[in-house]
Regions:
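N-terminal beta-propeller domains
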Residues: 1-88, 142-149, 298-375, 456-470
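Beta-sheet repeat architectures centered on beta-propellers
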Residues: 2-70, 394-397, 407-408, 415, ...
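Small/polar beta-strand repeat architecture
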Residues: 4-8, 130-131, 182-187, 191-300
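Trp- and S/T/G-rich repeat-edge/linker motifs of beta-rich repeat architectures
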Residues: 39-59, 79-99, 121-152, 194-203, ...
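Conserved beta-strand position repeated once per blade in WD40 beta-propeller domains
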Residues: 64, 103-104, 305, 357, ...
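Short loop/turn segments that connect beta-strands within the blades of beta-propeller domains
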Residues: 68, 75-76, 107, 114-116, ...
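Short hydrophobic/aromatic-rich beta-strand motifs
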Residues: 71-72, 109-113, 163-190, 220-226, ...
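Short, surface-exposed terminal/edge motifs of secreted or surface/virion proteins that either
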Residues: 81, 117-133, 170-202, 234-237, ...
């Protein structure tokens, strides 16, 4: 028997074992997914659901979080601090702050709280004000010239030449101009019997005495003094202004003040608006009225964006074009200009637009506008330098998206998510829908194990949309998780998130007693929609079989569905696992131009592989061609 030659139909098989991440663009491939939630690249090249979170505590109001030797939470008007050391007790401070959103930054052992301008000390567990104000509207106070030790002197005589036969320690005012005997041109002298000489007493300070005047100030503070009336009295020509506090006690403080004025050698006493000047020997009195109120203030500028760099807090405001830096290691002094390396610093920038954020990266203090990056560098105020770069900066409302991961700064710009490594910012969000990254109302960033968490809020009211995107910086893959991130802060080894009701730890295994079932998230809800499958096949082939290999890591259930050529979803399989188990799910698809797969459920699963079997087409690829 002779059989005629017949053409064989050869099948080809391809196994996809390397999966990408979220790709919302037209270029989404079979290895990526076009939409999905709660998947991660933790088991790359496989695709796994994210790890369950652990609930740490419930709180319905949270205005900010920061981690420094422990977790500080601003809950309404309360401060709650939980130390990292489990043997230490949690601290709660009632009515410590005003109710409202906070900007927090750490320096040393302190966490600064703005706009309240407070500092929480993680060692003493106390809150203190950065600024301080004393006002003497009705107070009785005295201004008197004094020496470096704070001593105020009284003289028994004055004249153009020293008296004969003086006693040891005798004081005398040597007058240079008889018409102005009490002016700073005269010299206060003291006699020393041991040396037999008169020596000048330098009065280069002013002692300010009043009830409670020095309670909130300390040595080396720079305070702004106003309303003293000293210039009106002719005692000091420039006492009002910024003064350096040499020492302070409850009811007195000493400030640096150069001698100057026609009525310098005397005491100035104020009681309300009444002002009296009395010479050092009590022989001359002068009285007048001053409408000004004496005020002493340690000023702290209003700032919206803060960062720490080289033991200084740097800040700026969206309302002015000035960058501030505090005194070295002292966040309570912002206007200390003494010509030394520890001075405060301020610089005005000339770029247009408002500041939108601040951060520190690679040793630089960085300040952003929507179209500009300002970089400050140097070791001390005398050699600080400011450079500017026109580039895609931080979007308005996205100041908290700034986050440093592995020496690279990530942030949300008006054009998408950017990465800055010291040169030019580069865009890393090309796989995301750009329309969903624009016109953001607020953005918040966090970091954990090389992953960049980005919380986005767009719109308001019923039209408001909220997303939590996760970028794997090592692999360049995007994922999306369910929103649990209205507030975020990281400790380096953990990421804390607040969902509006409770605070969660992103990695439950890093918390103490993480196995407790009552605190672990129950069954992670997940969903994934693949990219179009089949678009890369030649016309002479069609998909004859698809096989998914999945692994359940814990108690899980899931459903697999398919959509042909953009049609309705058709359920292919439903599976349940009580523990770790592997599944092979094969199915024979209809002939179509392309198909998409949807995988959704609850639990912990890993997509290990997707095997495609293609066969030669006879009668056309599409179903309508066969018919």
């Amino acid at each position: 028997m002779i059989l005629s030659n017949r053409n064989g139909l050869k099948n080809t098989r391809n196994m996809l074992r390397v999966f990408g991440g979220l790709n919302e663009t037209y270029s989404c491939t079979e290895a990526e997914y076009s939409a999905g939630i709660n998947f991660s690249a933790r088991n790359f090249p496989a695709l796994s659901t994210r790890l369950p979170r652990r609930k740490l505590r419930e709180t319905a109001e949270l205005n900010g979080m920061y981690h420094l030797n422990g977790l500080l939470m601003v809950c309404g008007t309360r401060l709650v601090y939980t130390p990292d050391d489990p043997d230490e007790l949690e601290v709660t401070l009632e009515n410590a702050v005003e109710d409202g959103k906070k900007t927090l930054v750490g320096i040393g052992t302190k966490i600064l709280i703005f706009p309240d301008k407070l500092a929480f000390d993680t060692v003493s567990r106390e809150v203190s004000a950065l600024g301080a104000v004393w006002s003497g509207a009705n107070a009785s106070m005295e201004f008197a010239p004094c020496d470096a030790e704070g001593r105020v002197y009284e003289v028994s005589g004055s004249g153009p030449s020293e008296p004969e036969n003086p006693k040891d320690g005798q004081l005398f005012l040597r007058v240079e101009d008889p018409e102005k005997p009490w002016s700073s041109e005269s010299t206060l002298e003291v006699y020393s019997e041991a040396s037999g000489n008169w020596s000048a007493v330098v009065l280069d300070c002013c002692r300010i005495s009043a009830k409670g005047v020095g309670a909130n100030f300390r040595a080396e503070d720079t305070v702004a003094l106003s309303g003293s009336g000293a210039e009106q009295a002719g005692q000091w020509s420039g006492l009002d202004g910024d003064r350096i506090v040499r020492d302070a006690s409850e009811d007195a403080l000493r400030v640096r003040a150069d001698p100057g004025g026609e009525w310098f050698y005397g005491r100035l006493t104020r009681t309300g608006a009444a002002v009296r000047w009395v010479s050092l020997d009590g022989s001359v009195r002068r009285e007048f009225v001053s409408a000004e109120t004496v005020r002493l203030e340690r000023r702290v500028p209003d700032m919206d964006y803060l960062t720490e760099c080289d033991n200084r807090i740097w800040g700026c405001s969206s309302k002015e074009n000035v960058i501030y830096a505090c005194k070295l290691g002292d966040p309570s002094n912002w206007f200390s200009y003494r010509g030394i390396a520890a001075d405060s610093y301020a610089v005005t920038v000339g770029s247009d637009g408002a500041f939108t954020g601040a951060a520190t990266c690679m040793g630089y203090a960085l300040f952003f506008k929507e179209n500009t990056l300002h970089k400050l560098y140097g070791s001390k105020p005398s050699d600080f330098q400011l450079s500017s770069l026109r580039c895609r900066g931080v979007a308005k409302g996205a100041a908290r998206s700034l986050c440093v991961i592995n020496e690279t700064l990530y942030y949300l710009s008006p054009d998408g998510v950017m990465a800055w490594d010291g040169s030019i910012p580069t865009k890393v969000s090309t796989a995301l829908d750009p329309a969903r990254l624009r016109n953001v109302k607020s953005a918040l960033g966090g970091a954990l194990d090389g992953r960049y968490y980005l919380h986005l809020v767009r719109g308001s009211g019923e039209a408001q949309t909220v997303r939590l995107l996760v970028y794997d910086t090592e692999r360049g893959l995007w994922q999306e998780e369910d929103v649990c991130s209205y507030e975020m802060t990281g400790s380096g080894g953990q990421l804390y998130l607040w969902d509006g009701k409770a605070v969660w730890a992103a990695d439950a295994e890093r918390e103490e007693n993480w196995q407790r079932a009552d605190s672990l998230e129950e069954g992670v809800r997940f969903e994934l929609v693949s990219g179009d499958i089949g678009l890369d096949r030649p016309e002479e082939q069609y998909l004859s079989r698809l096989t998914l290999r999945l692994e359940a890591e814990a108690k899980s259930r899931f459903e697999l569905a398919v959509s042909y050529d953009g049609g309705a979803w058709e359920t292919l399989a439903q599976r349940t696992a009580d523990g770790r188990r592997c599944f092979d799910i094969p199915f024979v698809p209809r002939r179509c131009g392309s198909l998409r797969l949807r995988l959704k459920g609850r639990g912990q699963i890993t997509l290990r592989s997707l095997t495609r079997t293609s066969a030669a087409a006879r009668g056309g690829i599409l179903a309508q061609e066969v018919n």
